[in-house]
A protein has these predicted regions:
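Single conserved hydrophobic/aromatic residue that forms the stacking wall/gate
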Residues: 1-8, 12
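Signature (C-motif/LSGGQ) region and adjacent switch/coupling loops
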Residues: 19, 27-30
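Conserved ABC ATPase signature
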Residues: 30-34, 38
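Hydrophobic anchor residue at the start of the ABC signature
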Residues: 44
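A short, proline-enriched helix->beta-strand linker immediately N-terminal to the Walker B motif
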Residues: 49-53
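Catalytic Walker B motif of ABC-type/P-loop ATPase nucleotide-binding domains
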Residues: 55-58
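Conserved catalytic loops of ABC-family nucleotide-binding domains
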Residues: 75-89, 97
Length: 112
């Protein structure tokens, strides 16, 4: 029973991420057939599928258009808030940084 419940939950989580990242129409495509933004969304979904307590993200919206970036960031930070997750995020975008509750700058190799 426990394994079946766990498996069903995993399938649901995978499908939820496929839907959120708008990847349903690309599910059977090979990696080399995906655009840069689609590959980025796959990477984000893969990082979330096991519900990690800590997410490390380096330029998570780097290859995404503005609308997709907003959608992904809203989902990511909603999940962090709702499920008590933490994220360490590196970005050059002030827009993306504004989603974070603590911000640090790296100046000459020193965090300030």
């Amino acid at each position: 029973r426990y394994i079946a419940v766990s498996w069903a939950r995993d399938v649901y989580k995978r499908q939820e991420l496929i839907d959120i990242m708008d990847l349903g129409c690309r599910i059977n495509h090979k990696p080399h057939e995906l655009s840069g933004g689609e590959k980025q969304r796959v990477a984000i979904a893969r990082s979330l599928v096991n519900s990690p307590a800590l997410i490390l993200a380096d330029e998570p919206t780097g290859n995404l258009d503005e609308d997709t970036s907003k959608h992904v960031l809203n989902y990511l930070f909603q999940a962090i808030h709702n499920f008590s997750k933490s994220i360490i995020l590196v970005t050059h975008s002030k827009y993306v940084a504004n989603y974070c509750n603590k911000k640090y700058d790296l100046i000459n190799g020193i965090l300030v």
